[in-house]
Amino acid sequence: MIRAIFGGTFDPIHNGHLQTAAALVKELGISTLALMPSAVPPHRPQPDASPEQRLDMVKLASQYHKAFTVEDWELRQDRPSFTANTLSEFKTQFPDDTLLFVMGMDSLMSLHRWHHWCQLIECAHLVVMPRAGVPFNPKNDELKEFISVHLTRDKNALNTQSQGLLYIAETPMVDVSATELRKQLQQREKNLPLPSNVYNYIRQHQLYL
């Protein structure tokens, strides 16, 4: 079984996340894609919304596509959410499944700064979605070597081995930035790239003001 996980801060989750994720579901022909908000990203500033609020927004956004599900494993842990630990735990829980960990190109380009980053590929395939303004051009030598060893252009290869591959998806580059979106919400702008139910939740709870 393919178990695909799209991890992110989702502060807030927006149409850019959802449109590219829906395109990935179609490209890979997977039946489900779990949206997993991270708990306390150790290498990034703390999210503006609480873990509970981010989870609520992800649950609302999951209605966007029938393949989307919600995974709250990291939010249920009483420790920082290192992706290497999460994938290792999932591999232990689901030893017969093939794990796909989905990330954006910006995450790949900074992957060498992640905790035990080389171990990610020992538990899962990494699937990377292109992002507007972020070229596929690694600067770090270790990361370059990592990519050269694990990169595949064949999406079907993800089904023939259980881990160890890095695949660059052909999903559209939707130019939405959560940072800019939070600024727009603070300025009370309208017609933002958010699902209507997520936008209403943000306004109801007076987030990002």
UniProtKB/Swiss-Prot annotation:
<comment type="similarity">
    <text>Belongs to the NadD family.</text>
</comment>
<dbReference type="GO" id="GO:0004515">
    <property type="term" value="F:nicotinate-nucleotide adenylyltransferase activity"/>
</dbReference>
<dbReference type="GO" id="GO:0005524">
    <property type="term" value="F:ATP binding"/>
</dbReference>
<protein>
    <recommendedName>
        <fullName>Probable nicotinate-nucleotide adenylyltransferase</fullName>
        <ecNumber>2.7.7.18</ecNumber>
    </recommendedName>
</protein>
<keyword id="KW-0662">Pyridine nucleotide biosynthesis</keyword>
<comment type="function">
    <text>Catalyzes the reversible adenylation of nicotinate mononucleotide (NaMN) to nicotinic acid adenine dinucleotide (NaAD).</text>
</comment>
<keyword id="KW-0520">NAD</keyword>
<dbReference type="InterPro" id="IPR004821">
    <property type="entry name" value="Cyt_trans-like"/>
</dbReference>
<keyword id="KW-0548">Nucleotidyltransferase</keyword>
<keyword id="KW-0547">Nucleotide-binding</keyword>
<dbReference type="InterPro" id="IPR005248">
    <property type="entry name" value="NadD/NMNAT"/>
</dbReference>
<dbReference type="InterPro" id="IPR014729">
    <property type="entry name" value="Rossmann-like_a/b/a_fold"/>
</dbReference>
<comment type="pathway">
    <text>Cofactor biosynthesis; NAD(+) biosynthesis; deamido-NAD(+) from nicotinate D-ribonucleotide: step 1/1.</text>
</comment>
<dbReference type="GO" id="GO:0009435">
    <property type="term" value="P:NAD biosynthetic process"/>
</dbReference>
<keyword id="KW-0808">Transferase</keyword>
<keyword id="KW-0067">ATP-binding</keyword>
<dbReference type="Pfam" id="PF01467">
    <property type="entry name" value="CTP_transf_like"/>
</dbReference>
